[in-house]
């Protein structure tokens, strides 16, 4: 097949060159037509205002699939950051990027500085799409304060035996709890089987504080719904449980951004919703590149998300009052104060550990 000629798309005052516009990024499915690279770029132009409202002025990691996405492809890099799969995360702004793009200098868990793309205009997202980006992973901070998150993120992750319907039920319990605590949550589909709930907060707390707030809320959810778990090790989670991934609130940890595409069949979108609309969703695949622009034409369900920024105090009290203590951090983090041993339960020799999970000195 002959290589298609590059085209130029206009995005505000910018012109963005799109190479190989006819490349098939998503193959057709029973419920959605195929998607080309140009259509991906046009999608982000179409949802640009809502996309920027949710993720604007934030540093963002790019999940890139330069050759398009197919089932069976892998997303991976090695320990040195080199691409080893079909897709990869791009955290540093690539060399040769247009000089009009803005960056934010963020720190990794090991205090290594990285200049990441900062989403300051729709054209930046379209340029990233031209570079193969399907999913944007924005930080929970804005460029004005890179050390103080302005949102709490609740990532409800169904385990293999659980379904989207299970996640939706737990999300309703989370909504009820948040409202009891005087907090307002804004839900979205993850673009797969999960659900994300965002709570705007005042940028007055550290990443660790926000993580502890998520743990506190998760433990109260565990008390109210026995399918919810905050267990870090997979061996300790029930197969049909909903894992609240509290570590997604740490520095350099992100979830798929609102209105992002996901590398799944049918070009699904991580779609913001009202609680009422979410309660009606049976199959999140119905919200995809082809259908979301029309859905959004009825109005941005997160239009008022920035109107109120909440305090974390009520959630931090849950963290302090409910039993359980500190939980494990991700493996790329240095050992943290008070953290339990990083030993998988399946690899522990029972007599070497006390009932609190601490290694017994020999």
Can you say where each PLM-predicted feature lies in the sequence?
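Helical (often loop-to-helix) elements that flank the catalytic cores of nucleotide-handling enzymes
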Residues: 81-110, 163-181, 199-228, 248-273
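Active-site loop/lid in soluble adenylation, ligation, and acyl-transfer enzymes
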Residues: 2-147
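Short beta-strand
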Residues: 62-64, 185-191, 232-236
């Amino acid at each position: 097949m002959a290589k298609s000629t590059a085209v130029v798309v206009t995005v505000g005052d910018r012109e963005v060159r799109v190479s190989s516009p006819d490349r098939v990024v998503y193959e057709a499915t029973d419920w959605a037509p195929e998607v080309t690279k140009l259509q991906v770029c046009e999608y982000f132009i179409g949802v640009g205002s809502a996309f920027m409202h949710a993720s604007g002025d934030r540093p963002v990691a790019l999940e890139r699939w330069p050759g398009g996405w197919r089932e069976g492809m892998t997303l991976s890099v090695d320990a040195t950051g080199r691409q080893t799969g079909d897709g990869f995360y791009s955290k540093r702004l690539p060399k040769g990027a247009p000089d009009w793009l803005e960056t934010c200098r963020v720190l990794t868990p090991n205090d290594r500085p990285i200049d990441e793309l900062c989403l300051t205009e729709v054209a930046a997202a379209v340029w990233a799409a031209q570079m193969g980006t399907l999913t944007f992973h924005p930080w929970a901070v804005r460029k004005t304060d890179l050390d103080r998150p302005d949102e709490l993120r609740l990532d409800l992750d169904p385990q293999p035996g659980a379904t989207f319907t299970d996640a939706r039920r737990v999300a309703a319990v989370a909504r009820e709890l948040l409202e009891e605590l005087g907090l307002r949550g804004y839900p979205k589909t993850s673009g797969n089987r999960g659900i994300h709930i965002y709570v705007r907060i005042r940028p007055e707390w550290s990443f660790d504080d926000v993580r502890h707030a998520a743990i506190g809320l998760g433990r109260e959810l565990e008390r109210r719904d026995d399918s919810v778990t905050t267990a870090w090790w997979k061996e300790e989670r029930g197969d049909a449980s909903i894992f609240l991934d509290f570590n997604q609130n740490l520095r350099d940890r992100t979830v798929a951004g609102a209105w992002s595409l996901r590398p799944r069949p049918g070009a699904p979108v991580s779609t913001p919703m009202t609680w009422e609309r979410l309660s009606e969703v049976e199959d999140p695949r119905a919200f995809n590149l082809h259908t979301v622009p029309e859905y959004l034409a009825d109005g941005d369900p997160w239009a008022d998300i920035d109107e109120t920024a909440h305090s974390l105090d009520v959630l931090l009290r849950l963290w302090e009052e409910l039993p359980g203590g500190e939980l494990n951090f991700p493996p790329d983090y240095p050992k943290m104060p008070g953290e339990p041993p990083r030993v998988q339960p399946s690899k522990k020799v029972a007599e070497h550990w006390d009932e609190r999970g601490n290694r017994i000195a020999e």
